[in-house]
Amino acid sequence: MFTYVGLIKLTSEGREHLEKAPEYLEKVKGIVELEGGILEKTYAVMGPYDFLAIVKYPDTETAFRVLAKIAKLEVLHTETFPAEEVDVFLKALV
């Protein structure tokens, strides 16, 4: 499984119905799990984003498929980045 970090912003529609944020996040979790991914952690954050998610997918194709399905919800925008532990990065330097 490969790790991805997702930075999530609610859309104007998502902010308009902020009380439904738990429902939106459950839908996202359901989509991730249905496609074989694992939503490891979700954090509420301060700043330009509303949430940060740590997600594992079996491959990049699955990540793309999940992100396309999430985009269809039209209540949040995501920016997603592949991530690796620092030790792996440091080993790649030598």
Give residue spans per PLM region.
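A generic hydrophobic-segment detector
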Residues: M1, I38, V55-Y57
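Short S/T/G/P-rich N-terminal loop/turn motif that feeds into the first structured element of a domain
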Residues: M1-E33, L90-V94
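A generic structural signal for short beta-strands and their flanking turns/coil linkers
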Residues: Y4, E35, G47-Y49, E74-L76
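Short, well-ordered beta-strand segments in beta-rich or mixed alpha/beta enzyme
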Residues: V5-K9, Y43-T62, V66
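Flexible, active-site-adjacent loop/turn segments at secondary-structure boundaries
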Residues: I8, E16, A44, E79, ...
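A short linear hydrophobic-aromatic micro-motif
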Residues: G36-Y43, H77-E79
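A short acidic, often aromatic-flanked loop/helix-cap motif at beta-alpha or helix-coil junctions
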Residues: P48, V86-F89
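An amphipathic, aromatic/His-enriched active-site/gating alpha helix that lines ligand/cofactor pockets
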Residues: Y57-D87
